[in-house]
Amino acid sequence: MKKAYLPLMAVCMGLAFVALVTVKAQAASIKLTYSNFFPAAHIQSQLVDSWCREVETRTKGRVNIKHYPGQTLTKAGECYEGVVKGRSDLGLSVLSYTQDRFPVMGTVDLPLGYTSGKVATAVANELYRKFRPKELSDSKVMYLHAHGPALVNTRGKAVRRLEDMKGLRFRTTGAAALIVKALGGIPVSVPMPECYQLIKSGKANGSTHPAESHKGWKLAEVENYVTAAYCISYTTTFFVIINKDKWNALPQDIKVIIEQINNEWLLQHGEAWDTSDTEGMQFFQAHGGQLIGLESSEAARWKMAVASIIDDYMTSLNERGLNGRDIVDFTIKTLNSMQ
């Protein structure tokens, strides 16, 4: 009888050992939190989910990340500071939601005539690598990404000429507020999560945003017209950062793995912006939305209206003790080399 029990005891002891090792491994795993303002169903949130899973997979479970989409951990405008102060370990939001805090990176958001999110994403990361701006030194930048061309979107009134912009209120942020003002509109600076209700309530006549927002933020339900002013299209730069202390505490091999994943994912974000722009425009038109083009002569008027914004921004950088000419010229040169 004793001989019969020996194999069973060995199996039980083995299982107990495995369970103990597993419990210890789980207890020793690094647990991080990730705050993100995009809705859970948005393609950008899906990319955050897949990034978190990839980190867990490649580190063999040594790092586990809890993702909080839809502003459930920190609000969009509080996300950066929330990471710096440790309210979340990682965060994804918009640099321009913290006004005037990121002057160098704000250059990317100027009306330079972007044609794609993939290009805008590449420009943002190249500018960061070139200048390593001090404004981002209180966090560890994982990577940056940027959406496709932002256009003029309205509810109830079509914008076909520059004069049609006069007096219209547009939800916008950052450099886009300067663009709206230069075109004759009135900027209403609030984060994107508030856009839908703002337009629906009549407190804004529209918004400046890329086509993806018609589906990703359901704005096709409250906007009727898109004015395709590609000649002055701008982008918005998004950050993905981690708390510096949390980053510095990670083992070196894990840092290497995460950096490799970052390089892969920033490309995916840029490509996703372009794919979702196509889907967003289809969604908009399926809801009865109308796309309005600009004649070349009219486009030239729009371009002239915003031209001073770039020069003024260069001057503002100089006033901060930064080399505005180098920063702006590098951004424009990099963009032109890619599109």
Predicted regions and their residues:
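Bacterial N-terminal signal peptides
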Residues: 9-20
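N-terminal secretory/targeting leader peptides
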Residues: 26-119, 134-339
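Positively charged n-region of N-terminal signal peptides that target proteins for export
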Residues: 1-4
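Intrinsically disordered and other compositionally biased segments
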Residues: 6-7, 26
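Signature of the catalytic double-stranded beta-helix
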Residues: 122-135
